[in-house]
């Protein structure tokens, strides 16, 4: 294919999501948020940071000593309006549940799992794997953890721009 032909190729169309049952959605939302909560615990133990609303909540947590879970929930509140108006009721409610569950799990984890030291390289590799897998679970079941993910999924659905590229 010549460069002229490839530049005229159409942009990818919007991604069509599959419908899942209530049980499948509940299982995916729980598993996805559990994976992400474990990743955040690893990052926290190793003193690492993350981007988006989770990163903002981490920074505020380090500065104020208010728990990450509470801050994460509050930081995501402004994004629900965008989700409600652009992504619909189902997506917004699932996202709200996912954010609330992640906030709860991050509050619970320090009471059930503790470690004295974790290698930052190991924490970043395993945490990244858990984080990516958890977010994929959520995205495939029309949910997110708020923040920039809502915007990237909107752009994927509306304009065909892959969420991973945004």
Label for each model-derived stretch:
Residues 2-166:
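Core subunits and conserved enzymes of cellular information-processing
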